[in-house]
Amino acid sequence: RICYIHKASLPRATKTCVENTCYKMFIRTQREYISERGCGCPTAMWPYQTECCKGDRCNK
């Protein structure tokens, strides 16, 4: 799986991951503000929410 792995303020970067999922994490009240992206599907703590997907570069 190829996932985006950059933090919000950094340029886009990708990584080939061993996990079968990618994720993006954002603040629940502001879905447009994505704080980070990466491999896997971590559990988020309030006020963050994680959205996971199963496709190359699906966490855009």
From Swiss-Prot:
It comes from the Eukaryota. Gene3D superfamilies: CD59 (2.10.60.10). One of its GO terms (molecular function) is toxin activity. InterPro entries: Snake_3FTx, Snake_toxin-like_sf, Snake_toxin_con_site, Toxin_cobra-type. Its main location: secreted. Residues 41-48 are annotated as: Important for binding to L-type calcium channels. Keywords: Calcium channel impairing toxin, Cardiotoxin, Disulfide bond, Ion channel impairing toxin, Secreted, Toxin, Voltage-gated calcium channel impairing toxin. GO terms for cellular component: extracellular region. Expressed by the venom gland. Disulfide bonds join 3-22, 17-39, 41-52, 53-58. It is found in: Secreted. SUPFAM superfamilies: Snake toxin-like. This specific blocker of the L-type calcium channel (Cav1/CACNA1) is a smooth muscle relaxant and an inhibitor of cardiac contractions. The sensitivity is higher in cells of the cardiovascular system. Neuronal, and insulinoma cells L-type calcium channel are more resistant. A total resistance is found in skeletal muscle cells. Belongs to the three-finger toxin family. Short-chain subfamily. L-type calcium blocker sub-subfamily. This is Calciseptin. It comes from Dendroaspis polylepis polylepis (Black mamba). The lineage of its organism: Eukaryota, Metazoa, Chordata, Craniata, Vertebrata.
